[in-house]
Amino acid sequence: MATRKIVLQGDEILTKVCRPVTNFDERLHELLDDMKETLIQANGAGLAAPQVGILRRITVVLNDDDEILELINPEIIYTEGEQTGPEGCLSVPGKFGMVTRPEFVRVRAQDRNGNWFEAEGYDLTARCFCHELAHLDGHLYTEHIDRFLSDEELMNY
């Protein structure tokens, strides 16, 4: 496993729509392992392939049980409720803004071997599912905020 360089806001790759994964091979497994290692080293909650320079529909997300889920070709199939809270991004370091997302999200995705499964999450996990899947369509959370939060506002939240 290796830690990959995280692409920062302003890089054009973060605005591109990712292509589906069709080959479930050793290269994919290596990328998934590297993405998980990168997520752990960055102390993040989620990471999408374009954030490490790869235009494929792949994300890794920390779930409600503190396990890292690998989501390949993911799609949101159900949402419920609403939550508004501070959100940040490894590609926009040190900046946070208030974003409204569903309180509960269920996704359908493939695992590293191509098998379809469903995963669900509340609160932070639901937020991460939405945030990371948005990356796969070339969107950043900054499109949903009025302004960045000050350090004081973030500490008081």
What are these regions (language model features)?
Residues 1-157:
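Positively charged
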